[in-house]
Curated annotation (Swiss-Prot):
Compartment(s) of residence: Nucleus; Chromosome
Organism taxonomic ancestry: Eukaryota, Metazoa, Echinodermata, Eleutherozoa, Echinozoa
Gene Ontology MF terms: DNA binding
Protein keywords: Chromosome, DNA-binding, Nucleus
Organism for this UniProt entry: Parechinus angulosus (Angulate sea urchin)
Record domain H15: where: 1-27
Family membership noted in the UniProt record: Belongs to the histone H1/H5 family.
Pfam families named among the record's database cross-references: Linker_histone (PF00538)
Protein name, per record: Histone H1.3, embryonic
Cellular component terms per the entry's GO annotation: nucleosome; nucleus
C-alpha cells in the first residue's frame, strides 16, 4: 500500500509533499 501511494504521489509531482503529509496523518 505504501509503495503504491508513493508512486501515485510521484506521478502528481507538485502536491506530492502535501499529499504525503496527509497520508502519514491518516496512518
Amino acid at each position: 500500500h505504501v509503495v503504491a501511494a508513493i508512486t501515485a504521489l510521484k506521478e502528481r509531482g507538485g502536491s506530492s509533499h502535501q499529499a504525503l503529509k496527509k497520508y502519514k496523518a491518516a496512518n
